[in-house]
Each structure stands twice: as C-alpha cells, then as structure tokens.
Swiss-Prot record:
E.C. numbers: 2.1.1.166
UniProt-annotated binding residues for S-adenosyl-L-methionine: 50, 52, 70, 88, 111
Keywords attached to this entry: Cytoplasm, Methyltransferase, rRNA processing, S-adenosyl-L-methionine, Transferase
GO molecular function, one term: rRNA (uridine-2'-O-)-methyltransferase activity
Main location: cytoplasm
Signal sequence coordinates: none
Record's protein name: Ribosomal RNA large subunit methyltransferase E
Species of origin: Syntrophobacter fumaroxidans (strain DSM 10017 / MPOB)
UniProt key word Signal: no
Gene that this polypeptide is encoded by: rlmE
Protein family (similarity comment): Belongs to the class I-like SAM-binding methyltransferase superfamily. RNA methyltransferase RlmE family.
Length: 197
C-alpha cells in the first residue's frame, strides 16, 4: 500500500531540493529538541531516499559525519562527509562493523517503516520490530550521552517499547510532527543522553 502524498510538504521538498517530504519531520524535531549539532557523527537507519541524510549533513557540517544504511540502495550523490551503505539493520554484525568503522555516534536516527498491509495490528507489530532493531543499534553504536530518534506506529507494543527507551536514556519525549499525515499512526520517540552501561 504505497502512494505519494502530493501535499504542501511534498511540493516544498521539491522546491527546496530535498529528496522526500519526510525531511520536515526531522526538521521539526531538530527545531524543538536540538538533537543534531555541528561536528556530530550521525547514523541514519532506513536512510532511503536520503532526505534525513541531507538535512543532518546541513547541521553537522564539514567537520561531522553522516552514515546512512538502508536495505535499498540510495542513488543520490551526497557531498563529502556522507557515507551510504546498503545493509540490513537487523543484522548484529552490521552494528559491530558500523561502530568499529565509523562510530561511536552522537546521534542515531531511524525513519524506518515496514511495508504496510493495511492491517493495523500486523503493521504496528512490524513497526515495533524495526523500532527494536533501531534501539538495539543505538545501544551498541551510540556514545554515552548520545541521542536517539525513531519512528514507531502506535500499537499494543508502544508502552513496552517506550519503557525500554526510558531505561536507556535520561530524557524521553514522544511527538507527532506536523509533517506527519493526520491519518498516520506514526509517532517519533526521542531519547536524549544515553545512560552509561
């Protein structure tokens, strides 16, 4: 069930040369919570088509690094300071190699979403699995004090997953950016300041 939303944010993204309207979700989170800072090392999970990498690169600047990972390839040519990898974020070996080669990271972002079936319970369960993978990646790839932002569909698993984030991070917030479609069940969980293990 895939379709393109040709709304205000779609046209704004085209006009401003972003690869997807999803950039405005991250932009709103950044405006509110100041997750990204110049010089940060950022890991973007589920990075295709690349608008979150574009935006993160603008914030971290030339002294920072943005590493994007997605099952699909990303065709856009990014400036220096952006590394794009094709891989499965549920693979524990990927987490180890990312940490060794590019980490530790200051921020882990995840806009991952499952292919939706239209069956709300099944879709939220698949979203929860992706969220858990992102959280596990954050635990292994973030430096202590690092930040985490991840999409999650509201469902039965929400409160359990939120408690897991609260155990790992000092400050946790849940938000639904204005750029999210009104009928969408997506929300974003923000974890700031990863606790030392």
């Amino acid at each position: 069930m895939s379709y393109t939303v040709r709304d205000h944010y779609f046209h704004k993204a085209k006009k401003e040369h972003y690869l997807a309207r999803a950039v405005y979700k991250l932009q709103e989170i950044q405006d509110r919570y100041k997750i990204l800072k110049p010089g940060n090392r950022v890991l973007d999970l589920g990075a295709a088509p690349g608008s979150w990498m574009q935006f993160a690169r603008e914030i971290v600047g030339p002294s920072g690094l943005v590493v994007g990972v997605d099952l699909k390839g990303v065709e856009h040519r990014f400036p220096e300071g952006v590394v794009v990898l094709q891989g499965d974020v549920t693979d524990p070996e990927l987490a180890r190699s990312l940490s060794v080669e590019h980490g530790p990271f200051d921020v882990v972002l995840s806009d991952m979403a499952p292919s939706t079936s239209g069956i709300r319970v099944a879709d939220s369960a698949r979203s929860a699995l992706l969220f858990e993978s992102a959280l596990e990646m954050a635990r292994s790839a973030l430096r202590p004090g690092g930040h985490f932002v991840a999409k999650l569909f509201q469902g039965a698993e929400f409160h359990v997953l939120l408690q897991a984030v609260k155990r790992d991070f000092e400050w946790v917030k849940v938000t639904k950016p204005d750029a999210s479609r009104k009928q969408s069940k997506e929300i974003y969980v923000i974890g700031m300041r990863l606790r030392k293990s």
